[in-house]
């Protein structure tokens, strides 16, 4: 896959990559989203379905973080997983998705900040995110040394994911970030989960991380997690990313 999106050409981009973290950008981007084609980061459902479906049961309560105008929630419904709640902090896109899928009342759409979820603890069996963490980290300049702000932001999200998952629940994260960059974020013992990694896609490979609530991290994973505030020296001089004029940069940002 040549680009991170599927379904249509990328819309207008923010002036700087850090704009991907701002709700104002997304509100503007999603004007008219109810009538536009879906846009999926890092592949559509068919590209990772074989990895995802073994982790899902028809009765699962599924939460999709940062849904945007992706087709994922609707495709889960069509695939036999009807209990899907999707959240995004852009009220514009939430309203658009409610309008687009008004014929499917089982699907729920809510405006919410993924760093502070308004759900009771242990209320979901599965939490999915695809590209949401990547967007929150898009302003980082050096993939080897994530800022303390970036580390804290990701920790806020992951802590909330762990909180809303039931014992035995699954968190599935799809991203462009390779294990040597992303594992250290997920591999914190206090989240209370195990961690596995797989790749998907043809040509350019994306990464799928599977966490089981109640499992344990390996010694090697815990060692990586311990590096989050004191990362190892990179093998070459740090690459300071320049703002890109297209959204392929998210496939290379590797945070």
Curated annotation (Swiss-Prot):
Keyword terms of this UniProt record: Methyltransferase, Phosphoprotein, S-adenosyl-L-methionine, Transferase
A family per Pfam: Methyltransf_11
Protein name as catalogued: EEF1A lysine methyltransferase 4
Positions of modified residues (Phosphotyrosine): 39
Gene behind this protein: EEF1AKMT4
Enzyme class: transferase
Residues binding S-adenosyl-L-methionine: 26, 30, 41, 66, 88-89, 113-114, 130
Motif, Required for methyltransferase activity: chain positions: 129-134
InterPro entries named in the record: Lys/N-term_MeTrsfase_sf, Methyltransf_11, SAM-dependent_MTases_sf
UniProt GO BP: methylation
Function: Protein-lysine methyltransferase that efficiently catalyzes three successive methylations on 'Lys-36' in eukaryotic translation elongation factor 1 alpha (EEF1A1 or EEF1A2).
Annotated organism of origin: Homo sapiens (Human)
Catalyzed reaction equations: L-lysyl-[protein] + S-adenosyl-L-methionine = N(6)-methyl-L-lysyl-[protein] + S-adenosyl-L-homocysteine + H(+); N(6)-methyl-L-lysyl-[protein] + S-adenosyl-L-methionine = N(6),N(6)-dimethyl-L-lysyl-[protein] + S-adenosyl-L-homocysteine + H(+); N(6),N(6)-dimethyl-L-lysyl-[protein] + S-adenosyl-L-methionine = N(6),N(6),N(6)-trimethyl-L-lysyl-[protein] + S-adenosyl-L-homocysteine + H(+)
Entry EC no(s): 2.1.1.-
Consequence the record notes for mutating residue 134 to A: Abolishes protein-lysine N-methyltransferase activity
């Amino acid at each position: 896959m040549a680009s991170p999106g599927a379904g249509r050409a990328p819309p207008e981009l923010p002036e700087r990559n850090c704009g991907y973290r701002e709700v104002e950008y997304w509100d503007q981007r999603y004007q008219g989203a109810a009538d536009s084609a879906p846009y999926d980061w890092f592949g559509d459902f068919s590209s990772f379905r074989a990895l995802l479906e073994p982790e899902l049961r028809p009765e699962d309560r599924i939460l999709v973080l940062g849904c945007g105008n992706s087709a994922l929630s609707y495709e889960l419904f069509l695939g036999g997983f009807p209990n899907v709640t999707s959240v995004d902090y852009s009220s514009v896109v939430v309203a658009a998705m409610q309008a687009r899928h008004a014929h499917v009342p089982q699907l729920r759409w809510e405006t919410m900040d993924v760093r502070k979820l308004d759900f009771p603890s242990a209320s979901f069996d599965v939490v999915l995110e695809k590209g949401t963490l990547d967007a929150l980290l898009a302003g980082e300049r050096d993939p080897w040394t994530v800022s303390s702000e970036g580390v804290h932001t990701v920790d806020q999200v992951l802590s909330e994911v762990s909180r809303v998952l039931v014992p035995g629940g699954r968190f599935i994260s799809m991203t462009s970030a390779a294990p040597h960059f992303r594992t250290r974020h997920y591999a914190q013992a206090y989240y209370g989960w195990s961690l596995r990694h797989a790749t998907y896609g043809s040509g350019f490979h994306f990464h799928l991380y599977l966490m089981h609530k109640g499992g344990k991290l390996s010694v090697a994973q815990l060692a990586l997690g311990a590096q989050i505030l004191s990362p190892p020296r990179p093998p070459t001089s740090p690459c300071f990313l320049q703002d890109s004029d297209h959204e392929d940069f998210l496939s290379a940002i590797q945070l």
